[in-house]
């Protein structure tokens, strides 16, 4: 088994084991520092090897906890991340962009402390706190209402009676962390590595009484939506304060960008003396009207920027430089380091990106280097401080996985293996194909992919659908029940929508959203096979580059063969049509709760295909709550709000 893949698999297994102990059984075996080291290592390896990504990885679950502990909440307004920088020059460039977009430079800005905590949204209806949710992926978070209500600095009732969502940061003060860790030690429990980890672990406890025992606090810093009669951010913060929320006192309001950079420098000296951890400042355009003019990108608002302090660094030795082969054939160098603690996390690997970067750094095995956690997440080598006398690292002439000659295209810095039969690439493609966001074949993880490729049972996507029980019985730890479950999962995946199949193919530039756009436009794979290059390129949001990539795949012998073989195997290649009229779900909002006979994803897809909208939380605007067995708080809330509650059978009758 490939060394990196095996390490990733082992790390995921260990982290899932410790997550279950910590979050579900409240019985951790390792310290938070040790856990953070495992988690940071896994996240780094996944970032360096995106082809090994798996939606089921613990790095894809907020705070590391198993997502089944909490129900999901769909944010009415996306909780976006902020663009961030460590450079005053970049802040000045941000200001210049705002000046250009607004047409003047006399707008006010607000700069305030960036608390190092956990983002949370609070929804109030009729002045009552109804839902508290984690940020999650920005679109969907987790319902942590019961735990959040134990935080004394969060009011359960406010005087504002219209519906409003207030956002802020949950944190633990430094002194409180010290006391909490003393209690943990006295009780024989593991201590927390830092305030942020303590806050994250505390709000995501299955037992709300544990959350109540933790010294959590909350600073309000923005709002998601709500009809408030204020013109700008500073006024809104004053309003929040009048409602009983705590807001950061470390704030300035000015129209002078130089005052912002001066505040940043002054505050860096002061932050060590603050009772809470701060990792930078946030700068926002004050006026809501001007914020609206500036707008947002897909991930962040243009009217705000996080001006962060430089990440922590450490000194260590490069033990070895290895080469990793990704799904697309790109060969990436990775430095294996003598483990070093940086900001409470053990770092034992660092990205070298590409061979030009190795040359720029002049790094060799045995060198002493400065490593930093860029963005406090992904470790990288900053520079060499002592020559270890090792040999110069040269780019491989042959693929470390298959031995084929490697190539470097003129317009790329990356070195690639272009052998389609390369085991590393085949495994990477298969892992992507079976992943949850693609064909979602439950149980077809890395260990299975590794073995079916090594045993030559599977060499392409279609081979997955030709696997036999007797073949699977030869795999490690596979007995009759496990074989049957995997074969059922493979069979179920044949019904996935065209959009998911397109994403599963791994066509360059085709992500989940692009797959949906293409599938909704063409509706059937035959239409795509018959389409011209112009047909692809003229689609809104596709454009020439993506259009060319998709067209090339559809016209390639390999693409046509793969599609034909998958069709023969019974894989669906059509996109469900949205019913525009003549049914009960058109324009209605549905919430699914409890255990259904069909997979939740299938039920949600059916609702969307018939014109419905799916939400993760219940409100007065919910049309139907579809309740299965063991329905919990969503059912209770629906009943209290008078929302129509229907069974799975009644739901299916609505879409007949």
Swiss-Prot record:
GO terms for cellular component: cytosol. One of its GO terms (molecular function) is DNA ligase (NAD+) activity. The active site is at 114 (n6-amp-lysine intermediate). InterPro entries: BRCT_dom, BRCT_dom_sf, DisA/LigA_HHH, DNA_ligase, DNA_ligase_AS, DNA_ligase_CS, DNAligase_adenylation, DNAligase_N. Its cofactor is Mg(2+); Mn(2+). Residues 580-656 form the BRCT domain. It catalyses: NAD(+) + (deoxyribonucleotide)n-3'-hydroxyl + 5'-phospho-(deoxyribonucleotide)m = (deoxyribonucleotide)n+m + AMP + beta-nicotinamide D-nucleotide. It comes from the Bacteria. NAD(+) binds at residues 32-36, 81-82, 112, 135, 169, 284, 308. Its EC number is 6.5.1.2. Pfam families: BRCT, DNA_ligase_aden, DNA_ligase_OB, DNA_ligase_ZBD, HHH_2, Nlig-Ia. Keywords: DNA damage, DNA repair, DNA replication, Ligase, Magnesium, Manganese, Metal-binding, NAD, Zinc. Signal peptide: none annotated. Zn(2+) binds at residues 399, 402, 417, 422. GO terms for biological process: DNA repair; DNA replication. It is an enzyme of class 6 (ligase). Belongs to the NAD-dependent DNA ligase family. LigA subfamily. DNA ligase that catalyzes the formation of phosphodiester linkages between 5'-phosphoryl and 3'-hydroxyl groups in double-stranded DNA using NAD as a coenzyme and as the energy source for the reaction. It is essential for DNA replication and repair of damaged DNA. This is DNA ligase. The gene is ligA.
């Amino acid at each position: 088994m490939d060394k990196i893949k095996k390490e990733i698999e082992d790390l995921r297994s260990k982290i899932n084991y410790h997550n279950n102990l910590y979050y579900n059984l409240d019985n951790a075996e390792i310290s938070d520092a040790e856990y953070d080291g495992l988690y940071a290592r896994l996240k780094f390896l996944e970032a360096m090897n995106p082809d090994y990504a798996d939606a089921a990885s613990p790095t894809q679950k907020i705070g590391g906890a198993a997502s089944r502990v909490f129900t999901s909440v769909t944010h009415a307004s996306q909780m976006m991340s902020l663009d961030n920088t460590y450079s005053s020059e970049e802040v000045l460039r941000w200001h210049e962009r705002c000046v250009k977009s607004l047409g003047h430079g006399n707008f006010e800005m607000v700069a305030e402390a960036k608390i190092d905590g956990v983002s949370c949204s609070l929804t109030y209806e009729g002045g009552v706190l109804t839902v508290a949710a984690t940020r999650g992926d920005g679109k969907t978070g987790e319902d942590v209402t019961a735990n959040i209500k134990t935080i004394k600095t969060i009011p359960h009732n406010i005087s504002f009676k219209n519906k409003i969502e207030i956002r802020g940061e949950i944190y633990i003060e430094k002194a409180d962390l010290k006391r909490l860790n003393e209690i943990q030690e006295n009780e024989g429990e593991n201590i927390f590595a830092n305030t942020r980890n303590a806050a994250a672990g505390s709000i995501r406890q299955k037992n709300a009484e544990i959350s109540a025992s933790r010294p959590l606090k909350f600073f309000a810093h923005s709002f998601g939506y709500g009809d408030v009669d204020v013109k700008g951010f500073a006024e809104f913060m004053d309003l929040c304060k009048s409602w009983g929320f705590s807001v950061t006192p470390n704030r300035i309001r000015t129209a002078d960008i130089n005052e912002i950079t001066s505040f940043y420098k002054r505050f860096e000296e002061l932050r060590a003396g603050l009772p809470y951890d701060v990792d930078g400042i946030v700068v926002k355009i004050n006026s809501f009207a001007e914020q609206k003019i500036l707008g947002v990108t897909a991930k962040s608002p243009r009217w705000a920027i996080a001006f962060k302090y430089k990440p922590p660094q450490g000194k260590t030795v490069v033990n070895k430089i290895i080469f990793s082969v990704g799904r697309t054939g790109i060969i990436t160098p990775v430095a294996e380091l003598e483990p070093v603690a940086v900001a409470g996390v053990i770092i034992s690997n660092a990205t070298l990106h590409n061979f030009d970067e190795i040359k720029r750094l002049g790094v060799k095995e045995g060198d002493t280097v400065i490593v930093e956690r860029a963005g406090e997440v992904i470790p990288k080598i900053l520079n060499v401080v002592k020559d270890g006398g090792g040999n110069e690292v040269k780019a491989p002439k042959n693929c470390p996985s298959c031995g084929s000659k490697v190539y470097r295209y003129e317009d790329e810095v990356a070195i690639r293996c272009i052998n389609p039969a390369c085991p590393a690439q085949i495994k990477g493609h298969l892992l992507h194909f079976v992943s949850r966001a693609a064909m979602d074949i439950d149980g077809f993880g890395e260990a299975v992919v590794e073995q079916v490729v090594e045993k030559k049972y599977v060499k392409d996507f279609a081979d997955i659908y030709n696997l036999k029980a007797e073949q699977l019985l030869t795999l490690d730890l596979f007995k009759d029940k496990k074989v049957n479950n995997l074969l059922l999962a493979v069979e179920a995946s044949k019904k996935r929508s065209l959009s998911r199949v397109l994403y599963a193919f791994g066509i360059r530039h085709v992500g989940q959203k692009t797959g949906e756009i293409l599938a909704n436009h063409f509706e059937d794979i035959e239409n795509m096979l018959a389409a011209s290059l112009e047909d692809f390129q003229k689609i809104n949001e596709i454009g020439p580059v993506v259009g060319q990539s998709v067209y090339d795949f559809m016209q390639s012998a390999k693409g046509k063969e793969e599609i034909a073989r998958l069709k023969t195997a019974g894989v669906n290649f059509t996109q469900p049509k949205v019913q525009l009229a003549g049914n009960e779900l058109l324009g209605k909002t549905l919430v699914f709760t409890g255990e259904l006979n069909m997979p939740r994803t299938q039920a949600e897809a059916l609702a969307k295909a018939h014109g419905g909208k799916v939400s993760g939380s219940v409100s007065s605007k919910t049309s139907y709550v579809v309740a299965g067995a063991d329905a919990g708080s969503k059912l209770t809330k629906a009943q209290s709000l008078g929302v129509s509650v229907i069974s799975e059978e009644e739901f299916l009758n609505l879409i007949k």
